[in-house]
Regions:
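N-terminal beta1-alpha1 ligand-phosphate binding loop
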Residues: 1-33
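Short, glycine/serine-rich, charged loops/turns that create anion-binding
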Residues: 11-12, 42, 110-111
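Glycine-rich phosphate/pyrophosphate-binding loop and the adjoining helix
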Residues: 137-204
Length: 204
């Protein structure tokens, strides 16, 4: 079963970004996919700022990302840029850390103008790490939150629909990638079998 790593790049607690990340992952778990969560705010700040990849907690976080089949990244947008916390983590990753993976970028913010940070700020960085595919990004405006006495109850219908559709599209990409890998494996096995048969015939 494919493993998805959901990465929260928010330094805040409580965090609207983390809540949106959980909502985005709900359709994925409903499809039977395994989703693990990594909250970057729980990593040691000094190790991140010093780019100390040898720190046990940081090294474990990097290893979890590299082992995942797909990644959902969620970040708040500050001054038209993704969070510094997420940047320090991405800077620690190997050049091709996302190779073969499907990535879904999410962002939250207080202005629709901040949505540009996804396509012009975060996406180019992700593409430089050689992912198999980057799904359509979703920006969630803070005013779309529906809150009750116990916190976030959900999102406005239009926003929730966009988020659910993005999650479903992301899962479809992951399924397509897995199917492609299986087909390639089958073709390779057939070629190896054909070569072996040809060799046996020549030997006979």
């Amino acid at each position: 079963m494919p493993t998805i790593l959901a990465v929260s790049g928010s330094p805040s607690l409580p965090s609207f970004t983390h809540e949106v990340l959980a909502l985005a992952c709900a359709p994925l778990t409903a499809r039977g996919l395994r989703v693990d969560t990594l909250a970057l705010r729980e990593l040691p700040a000094q190790a991140l700022l010093a780019a100390d990849g040898g720190d046990p907690a940081v090294a474990d976080a990097v290893a979890r990302l590299e082992a995942a089949d797909a990644v959902v990244l969620a970040t708040p947008v500050y001054k038209a840029a993704y969070s510094g916390l997420l940047k320090t983590f991405l800077d620690l990753l190997p050049q091709h850390a996302l190779a073969g993976k499907v990535v879904l970028p999410l962002a939250t913010g207080g202005s629709m103008a901040h949505a540009l940070a996804l396509d012009y700020g975060l996406r180019p960085v992700l593409m430089s790490m050689a992912p198999a595919a980057v799904a359509n990004a979703v920006f969630v405006h803070a005013e779309s939150a529906l809150r009750g006495p116990e916190g976030l109850r959900g999102l406005e219908p239009d926003t929730r629909t966009r988020l659910d559709q993005a999650a479903e599209g992301f899962a479809d990409l992951l399924d397509a990638l897995a199917l492609h890998a299986l087909l390639n494996e089958a073709v390779t096995d057939d070629l190896v079998t054909a070569e072996r048969l040809a060799g046996l015939r020549q030997a006979a």
